[in-house]
């Protein structure tokens, strides 16, 4: 685990999703708690609980695995997560320049002056901020 807790969170979720794991355990910080709450609200995660070991808190998230049925059979959908603004290169945007991820099917998570929120909420409130990640 490095200093970039957002990248650690996204990588843990991505790896657990690729390996078909049911749960993910990440270190609990204010920013990771807010991002996980957004993922829970948007339906990418089924449940979240806070777990304490010694003096450290962890978030244990249960992933949602969706299965789709086609003519060729059943296949499992994957959750794609991409870190945009990172410690070496910060990406900021105003509310007019907030990108629509996958034509509005995905979400962008922004850190604004009013807290961490999705791209839709930021457009409604007409505020910009730092683009943290894309999820689709």
UniProtKB/Swiss-Prot annotation:
Single GO BP term: translation
Gene that specifies this protein: rps8
Pfam family, one: Ribosomal_S8
Family: Belongs to the universal ribosomal protein uS8 family.
NCBIfam families recorded: PRK00136.1 (NF001109)
Location of this chain's protein in the cell: Plastid, Chloroplast
The keyword Chloroplast is annotated on this UniProt entry: yes
Function: One of the primary rRNA binding proteins, it binds directly to 16S rRNA central domain where it helps coordinate assembly of the platform of the 30S subunit.
Gene3D superfamilies assigned: 3.30.1370.30, 3.30.1490.10
Key words of the record: Chloroplast, Plastid, Ribonucleoprotein, Ribosomal protein, RNA-binding, rRNA-binding
Protein's UniProt keywords contain Coiled coil: no
Highest taxon above the source species: Eukaryota
Protein name per its UniProtKB record: Small ribosomal subunit protein uS8c
Organism: Triticum aestivum
């Amino acid at each position: 685990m490095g200093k970039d807790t957002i990248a650690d969170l996204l990588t843990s979720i991505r790896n657990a999703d690729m390996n078909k794991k049911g749960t993910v355990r990440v270190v609990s910080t204010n920013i990771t708690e807010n991002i996980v709450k957004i993922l829970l609200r948007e339906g990418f995660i089924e449940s979240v609980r806070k777990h304490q070991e010694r003096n450290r808190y962890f978030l244990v998230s249960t992933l949602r695995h969706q299965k789709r049925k086609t003519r060729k059979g059943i296949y499992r959908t994957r959750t794609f997560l991409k870190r945009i603004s990172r410690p070496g290169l910060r990406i900021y945007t105003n509310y007019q320049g907030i990108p629509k991820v996958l034509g509005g099917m995905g979400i962008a998570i922004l850190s604004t002056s009013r807290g961490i929120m999705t791209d839709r909420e930021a457009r409604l409130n007409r505020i910009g901020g730092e683009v943290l990640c894309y999820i689709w």
